[in-house]
Amino acid sequence: MDNREALKTFMTGENFYLQHYLGAHREELNGEHGYTFRVWAPNAQAVHLVGDFTNWIENQIPMVRNDFGVWEVFTNMAQEGHIYKYHVTRQNGHQLMKIDPFAVRYEARPGTGAIVTELPEKKWKDGLWLARRKRWGFAERPVNIYEVHAGSWKRNPDGSPYSFAQLKDELIPYLVEMNYTHIEFMPLMSHPLGLSWGYQLMGYFALEHAYGRPEEFQDFVEECHTHNIGVIVDWVPGHFTINDDALAYYDGTPTFEYQDHNKAHNHGWGALNFDLGKNEVQSFLISCIKHWIDVYHLDGIRVDAVSNMLYLDYDDAPWTPNKDGGNLNYEGYYFLQRLNEVIKLEYPDVMMIAEESSSATKITGMKEIGGLGFDYKWNMGWMNDILRFYEEDPIYRKYDFNLVTFSFMYVFKENYLLPFSHDEVVHGKKSMMHKMWGDRYNQFAGLRNLYTYQICHPGKKLLFMGSEYGQFLEWKSEEQLEWSNLEDPMNAKMKYFTSQLNQFYKDHRCLWEIDTSYDGIEIIDADNRDQSVLSFIRKGKKGEMLVCIFNMVPVERKDFTIGLPVAGIYEEVWNTELEEWGGVWKEHNQTVQTQEGLWKDYEQTLTFTLPAMGASVWKIKRRLKSTKTVTNKNPKGVENEK
């Protein structure tokens, strides 16, 4: 694509490789080697290139504006590693230093200057992983995600975050030890304030300087792929930092943000909202995400704050209705459809995940039926209900048992991912362990029960770092995790439990093979609120089945009976109360043979001891002939609604 064609398609919103044109690029012009700098500032009066190579003199290198509002200059003064900015004379005459929106590196905070950088061509060695990903996809594969804030998983003695070179040596072996299938990073793009956790971005094409060089992250991803671990990154296409030297009112007029003040300003987050209906902004954002997928071989993108992009009244502030008087943001809606359409056309095996908190449907529906086209939606309703239930005193749980069972009424309306994310362990919400009811023993018992329920419930999985071993305190973004907790035997056993649970998930196809239809689950009993016991069967494509029973109160139930559709000899393959995991049981239940007898819609029964505050999972060891094998005629098995 020549330069003029690149500009034309930029203006029509069809240039998705914009970073190859705008920004700083090494070139040869008339036999001279140097760099060409280009920046989009259509309403600026003047733009000058300044940097180390001009001793920061503001008027030494003027740039020339073309008909498309792009300013350009070639210079042989700039060298690899030099820091630079654009000195912009805005429409009103006010002058301001601005970042290069297309830079691939920035200097360390608190500086915001771009660094002249040509990304090296990496010779990737993850071809086998990519081939498998293309062949297998992810819908019928295990997806169990470890969510990480790269700046606080571990820190150096001086308090600085680990670089990706360090994370490669320590985090990847930890992922392997813990048997996760994927890692998801909170935003890695350049951001001026660490306390924003990366959710108020400045440089959309650049890796945050504190995390190391781009090639270090490439090597990290490659090493993950070598160990069969996928890499997902959070991305924020809805809003950006309000800082004057970044994207905000770049040329003195609304450039990246909406013209309408109410639509532009995000009061809740102190940010500015992208004008998602503007062609140039669409080119910018889609180019950004394709850049990250291409340069870093990412396996998934989690799109942050989708509700903010969909609803004009999402922010608790004055808002401007759409042309029909409603609150739906048509520009955001159509942008998200187009985003997923473009990404899926080129990268069908890259996951697109929506963090969307409303009750809107069709987030994962196809565009043809009015959907947005995401692969997965975070199930925030399930997460809120289930955490509220597990925090409650068991005496009262029978009155709120619908909090556990309600999800079965809507579980397949979207393709869901079940998140216990960073948002649930900050701002006074308590750590996952401290959310659990009771004394320390019962808190860990509840946590083992909860995590087993998450693994057995239909949907892909996500757990935030530190939660895997029951970290004592809330997450603090400016400190490393409380690794000293692992000196406590209860935390060490909790960590071992989570690693074994993750392996259990990977080993049993019925827990991930059919995640999006009732073919993958059969409810045995969702109405036993008096005992607060829930039971269901997870099913695979080739007849594999696991019987999952959850006792959600601290009362052991001897001679507990459930109905089953298949006669046979069953063995307990999972029990959250084993001593090795912090419980009190020395061994599993003995194998049990079903008995003929009417139990609800079933004519086979299984009787065993159900551990207090425990989860018990059974697998058929040998099928027996029976003339009375019955399948539950109500696969949802839930009569009660919220």
From Swiss-Prot:
Location of the active site:
D304, E355
Work out whether the entry's keyword set contains Glycosyltransferase.
yes
Protein name, entry field: 1,4-alpha-glucan branching enzyme GlgB
Instruction: Report the InterPro entries cross-referenced here.
Output: A-amylase/branching_C, Branching_enzy, GlgB, GlgB_N_E_set_prok, Glyco_hydro_13_cat_dom, Glyco_hydro_13_N, Glyco_hydro_b, Glycoside_hydrolase_SF
The catalysed reaction is:
Transfers a segment of a (1->4)-alpha-D-glucan chain to a primary hydroxy group in a similar glucan chain
- GO CC, alphabetical: cytoplasm; cytosol
Instruction: Tell me the organism.
Output: Streptococcus pneumoniae (strain ATCC BAA-255 / R6)
**Subunit-level organization:** Monomer.
| Upper taxonomic lineage | Bacteria, Bacillati, Bacillota, Bacilli, Lactobacillales
**Pfam families of this UniProt entry?**
Alpha-amylase, Alpha-amylase_C, CBM_48
Name the top EC class.
transferase
